[in-house]
Amino acid sequence: MATVKVTLVKSLNGRLANHKACVKGLGLRRINHTVEVQDTPENRGMINKAYYLLRVEG
């Protein structure tokens, strides 16, 4: 299955709780932390919900 690189580029301070939960669910912990996640509908949904905090490649 294809993978997607996701990087947290903005702080989580003051963000909605469900957006923080989506970022945590993707495995991101701090700014400029990058993870590779599988390109599934579940992960795409989390990325789309918190898109303004993330940079997505691939």
From Swiss-Prot:
Q: Give GO terms for biological process.
A: translation
Q: Does the keyword Phosphoprotein apply?
A: no
What protein name applies here? Answer: Large ribosomal subunit protein uL30
Cited HAMAP family: Ribosomal_uL30_B
Q: How does it assemble?
A: Part of the 50S ribosomal subunit.
Key words, A-Z: Ribonucleoprotein, Ribosomal protein
Q: Name one GO molecular function term.
A: structural constituent of ribosome
Q: Which family does it belong to?
A: Belongs to the universal ribosomal protein uL30 family.
**InterPro entries (alphabetical):** Ribo_uL30_ferredoxin-like_sf, Ribosomal_uL30_bac-type, Ribosomal_uL30_ferredoxin-like
Annotated Gene Ontology cellular components are:
cytosolic large ribosomal subunit
Is the keyword Ribonucleoprotein in the record?
A: yes
- Please name the source species: Pseudomonas aeruginosa (strain ATCC 15692 / DSM 22644 / CIP 104116 / JCM 14847 / LMG 12228 / 1C / PRS 101 / PAO1)
| Domain of life assignment | Bacteria
